[in-house]
A protein has these predicted regions:
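Bacterial N-terminal signal peptides that target proteins for export
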Residues: 1-9
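Bacterial N-terminal signal peptides
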Residues: 8-16
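Noncatalytic, solvent-exposed loop/strand surfaces
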Residues: 19-418
Length: 418
C-alpha cells in the first residue's frame, strides 16, 4: 500500500469517527476554530521564572502558532536560511526538525517572514505551509508525504508576506489565495495534495487592498458547513464541495480606500459570524443560518455594524459578549445588539499581533513585547494579571493538556502550575 493510499484511508477513518480533541489544539484557532479551550485551572500569572514548566529554544523567529496533539507540539520557524518544521514533546525536548523550504526576505522586522502560517494536524499527520508557497504533509516522524506549490495559482505578489493558514476539515485542506495576482479559494485533498476544486473570488479592491493576511475558516451550522474567506473588500462563504459562493458581506470598505488590506480574520460560530475590516472601518455581525446573497443593512441576516474594528487581532466571543482588540483598547460589544459594553485601555503599552484565547471565563492576550494579560470575561472590565516574558511574541497562544503554550521569537514557553 502506498503512503498516499494509506494516508487517504487514515483520513477517511478520522472523518468517520470524531477525534477526541478536547485536550488538543489541532489548528491555529483551536479545536473549533473560535479561539476557545475547555481547559480549566490555567494559571493567571506567569513570568520568566514563574509558572513556566519549561522553555524551549526555538531555531529562529516566526509568528506561526503551535498546534498540539497528545505529546507532540508542531510549529514552523526560520532556521538560518530555511523554514523548518519543528516537533517538540510536551516535556520540552525536541523530537525532530525538518527543512520545509528555503526562507525568503522577511517583511517588517520578521512580522512577515516565511514562518508565519500555522500548522494543522489530525493526530496522524501535520501540514505545514511556507512563505515561498510550499504546502507539505508530514507524518509524526517528520517524513514528508507530499508537497504542492501554491504559487501554481499565481506568483505571489504581496507586500508583507504570506500569512494565510490552511484549514483542515474532514480530509480536505481549504486555503484562500489572495494577493494582487490572484483572488481564489482552493480545496486540496489532505491525503495527496491534489486539487479538488478552485473557485475564483471576484473583488473590487484597488491598490494594496487585494493583499490579504487573514485566513479562511469552516463554518458549521444549519445549512452548512461552508468555507468562509476574507479579503479584497469582502467576506464570502463558499460551498465545500464546489467553491460556489453563497453569500458575501458588503460595505467593509465604504470609502474604496486603496490601502484597505485585511489582516484580522473573522470570528465564526454556529449562530454568529463577526467580520472585521481594517483601520477605521466597521465590524459587521450577522446570523449565518440561512444567509444568502449580499449581507448589508437591508438583509435580515445582518444583526449590527459597529463603528470601529480590530486591525490585526480576530474578534473572540465569550458568552453574550464579543471582544475587539486594538493596539490600545479592548472593546466589549453585546453580541446580540452591537451595543458597546465597555472600551478600556490595557495596562501594557504594546502592539498586538497574536489572537486572543478564551478558557475558563478568562481571556488570554499576549502582545508583541511579550507582555501577557489575563482579563476576566464579563460586562465589567477587570485585568486579573499582567505578565512579562521579556521577549517578542507575534504568535497566538495555544492551550492543550492543562498547559498554555506561548511561542516567542526566542523560546517556546510551556506555562502551567508546577
Amino acid at each position: 500500500m502506498t503512503r498516499r493510499i494509506l494516508l487517504a484511508c487514515t483520513l477517511a477513518a478520522a472523518a468517520a469517527v470524531p477525534a477526541a480533541v478536547a485536550d488538543n489544539w489541532p489548528q491555529w484557532r483551536g479545536p473549533k476554530n473560535d479561539g476557545h479551550s475547555a481547559e480549566k485551572g490555567l494559571p493567571a500569572e506567569w513570568g520568566p521564572d514563574k509558572n513556566v514548566v519549561w522553555k524551549f529554544k526555538v531555531p529562529g523567529p516566526g509568528s506561526s502558532t503551535p498546534c498540539v496533539w497528545g505529546d507532540d507540539i508542531f510549529f514552523t520557524s526560520i532556521d538560518g536560511a530555511d523554514v523548518a518544521l519543528v516537533c517538540v514533546g510536551t516535556d520540552g525536548r525536541q523530537k525532530w526538525k525538518v527543512k520545509v523550504a528555503p526562507a525568503g526576505k522577511s517583511g517588517r522586522g520578521d512580522e512577515g517572514n516565511d514562518a508565519s502560517a500555522s500548522c494543522s494536524t489530525d493526530g496522524k499527520h501535520v501540514w505545514a505551509f511556507a512563505g515561498n508557497g510550499k504546502l507539505a504533509c508530514y507524518d509524526f516522524a517528520g517524513k514528508e508525504v507530499w508537497a504542492a506549490d501554491i504559487q501554481r495559482y499565481g506568483k505571489f505578489r504581496i507586500q508583507f508576506g504570506i500569512h494565510w493558514t490552511p484549514v483542515l476539515y474532514k480530509g480536505t485542506l481549504y486555503l484562500q489565495v489572495m494577493h494582487r495576482e490572484t483572488q481564489s479559494v482552493v480545496a486540496l485533498d489532505a491525503a495527496t495534495g491534489e486539487q479538488k476544486w478552485k473557485a475564483d473570488r471576484p473583488g473590487y479592491g484597488k491598490g494594496e487592498s487585494p493583499d490579504t493576511y487573514a485566513s479562511a475558516f469552516v463554518w458549521e451550522g444549519p445549512g452548512g458547513p461552508l468555507l468562509v474567506a476574507h479579503g479584497n473588500d469582502y467576506c464570502t462563504a463558499h460551498a465545500l464541495d464546489t467553491g460556489a459562493e453563497v453569500w458575501r458581506v458588503a460595505g467593509l470598505n465604504p470609502t474604496s480606500n486603496g490601502a484597505w488590506r485585511f489582516v484580522a480574520s473573522p470570528l465564526v460560530t454556529p449562530d454568529l459570524i463577526v467580520v472585521p475590516s481594517c483601520k477605521n472601518g466597521p465590524t459587521v455581525a450577522f446570523n449565518p443560518v440561512g444567509a444568502k446573497g449580499t449581507i448589508n443593512p437591508e438583509n435580515p441576516a445582518e444583526l449590527w455594524r459597529f463603528k470601529s474594528t480590530p486591525d490585526v487581532v480576530a474578534p473572540i466571543r465569550v458568552g453574550d459578549i464579543v471582544y475587539l482588540l486594538g493596539d490600545g483598547p479592548l472593546t466589549a460589544v453585546d453580541a446580540k445588539t452591537g451595543a458597546q459594553v465597555y472600551r478600556q485601555a490595557l495596562p501594557a503599552k504594546q502592539i498586538y499581533r497574536g489572537n486572543m484565547v478564551a478558557a475558563d471565563d478568562k481571556i488570554y492576550i499576549v502582545g508583541r513585547e511579550g507582555v501577557g494579560l489575563v482579563v476576566q470575561a464579563g460586562k465589567e472590565f477587570e485585568v486579573l494579571a499582567t505578565n512579562d516574558l521579556k521577549e517578542k511574541v507575534y504568535a497566538s497562544p495555544a492551550v492543550a493538556g492543562g498547559r498554555l503554550y506561548v511561542r516567542g521569537f526566542e523560546h517556546l514557553y510551556c506555562i502551567g502550575a508546577k
